[in-house]
């Protein structure tokens, strides 16, 4: 009872804090950027991380197993993964380049997890025999970390496509400066140092230069984050194959979840391959990553919504039955 109450409190604390963080970011975007509010939002994400960590640890203690056994627990862990990705660049150089993506992603996943749709999953149950394995932590955690990284990288690619195909005059107005502030990494300072070079350039050339710099940074960080997610995904698939052999007697069973995991892996393998070809970098590779964004959600939610296959643990169908 105590652990259940503590979990309930931590859930509401983390959701409330991240809601405040989103509000602060919207204020900076729509009204005016304030350094104090920006620092407060970063500290809020740190507090959210510790709240979700406490939530996972609490559920781990009273359930007796690592909290990755159903859709509710996996969504909480996915939200926790987004908060990690949010904090890593901040602690490295006190700048956050992913705040426009990670904070909304975290509140979306946690909001869905705590919604009424998954109420019956909030109570921990005894694991079925197939899930009572040391591979549970390894396989599922790697898959969810890969989903978080690949989703963030894919959203960066989506942003790249939006900027690439919009008119230059719309890119650098007041309404879009939030994304610019997130990814310019000192390009403004560089331009000030090189002001003499740009004195005779037209406004179109100036905005085109900024657009080029922004898309290059988006492409660069999308590649780095997706590469990390691809490594996690590969480890997750391989560890899952070993676990499947122990549980079901075969490394690969062509289960719907396995098929979509392979499709996801193939899509991002194609993305990484296109990045090795200089002529295909930028918008071309971003299109592949954007397709991958949709594939990830199909892979993650598809089986849980349909409740079919060997990976249907914690699905909506299973719970309703």
UniProtKB/Swiss-Prot annotation:
InterPro entries: Cyt_c_assembly, Cyt_c_biogenesis_CcsA, Cyt_c_biogenesis_CcsA/CcmC
Keywords: Chloroplast, Cytochrome c-type biogenesis, Membrane, Plastid, Thylakoid, Transmembrane, Transmembrane helix
Pfam families xrefs: Cytochrom_C_asm
Example GO BP: cytochrome complex assembly
Gene Ontology CC annotations of this record: chloroplast thylakoid membrane; plasma membrane
Compartments, as annotated in UniProt: Plastid, Chloroplast thylakoid membrane
GO molecular function, one term: heme binding
Membrane topology: Multi-pass membrane protein
Record field: transmembrane: 9-29, 44-64, 71-91, 98-118, 143-163, 225-245, 252-272, 286-306
Family the UniProt entry places it in: Belongs to the CcmF/CycK/Ccl1/NrfE/CcsA family.
PANTHER family per the UniProt record, alphabetical: CYTOCHROME B_B6 PROTEIN-RELATED, HEME EXPORTER PROTEIN C
Quaternary structure note: May interact with Ccs1.
Protein role: Required during biogenesis of c-type cytochromes (cytochrome c6 and cytochrome f) at the step of heme attachment.
Name of the protein in its database record: Cytochrome c biogenesis protein CcsA
Organism from which the protein derives: Acorus calamus var. americanus (American sweet flag)
Gene for this chain: ccsA
């Amino acid at each position: 009872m105590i652990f259940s109450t503590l979990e309930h409190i931590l859930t509401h604390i983390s959701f409330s804090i991240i809601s405040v963080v989103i509000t602060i970011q919207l204020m900076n975007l729509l009204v005016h950027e304030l350094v104090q509010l920006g620092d407060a939002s970063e500290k809020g994400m740190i507090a959210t991380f510790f709240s979700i960590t406490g939530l996972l640890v609490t559920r781990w203690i009273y359930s007796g197993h690592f909290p990755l056994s159903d859709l509710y627990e996996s969504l909480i862990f996915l939200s926790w993964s987004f908060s990690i990705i949010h904090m890593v660049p901040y602690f490295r150089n006190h700048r956050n380049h992913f705040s426009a993506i990670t904070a909304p992603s975290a509140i979306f996943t946690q909001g869905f997890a705590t919604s009424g749709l998954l109420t019956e999953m909030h109570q921990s149950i005894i694991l079925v025999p197939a899930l009572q394995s040391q591979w549970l932590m390894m396989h599922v955690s790697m898959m969810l970390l890969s989903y978080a990284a690949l989703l963030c990288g894919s959203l960066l690619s989506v942003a790249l496509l939006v900027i690439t195909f919009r008119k230059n005059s719309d890119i650098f107005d007041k309404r879009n400066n939030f994304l610019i502030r997130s990814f310019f990494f000192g390009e403004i300072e560089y331009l000030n140092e090189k002001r003499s070079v740009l004195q005779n350039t037209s406004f179109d050339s100036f905005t085109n230069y900024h657009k080029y710099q922004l898309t290059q940074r988006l492409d660069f960080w999308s590649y780095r984050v997706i590469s990390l997610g691809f490594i996690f995904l590969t480890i997750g698939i391989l560890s899952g194959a070993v676990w499947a052999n122990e549980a079901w007697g075969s490394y690969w069973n062509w289960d719907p979840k396995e098929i979509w995991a392979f499709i996801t892996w193939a899509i991002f393998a194609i993305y990484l391959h296109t990045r090795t070809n200089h002529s295909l970098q930028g918008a071309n590779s971003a299109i592949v990553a954007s397709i991958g964004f949709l594939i990830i959600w199909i892979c993650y939610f598809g089986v849980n919504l349909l409740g079919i296959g060997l990976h249907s643990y914690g699905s909506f169908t299973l719970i309703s039955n």
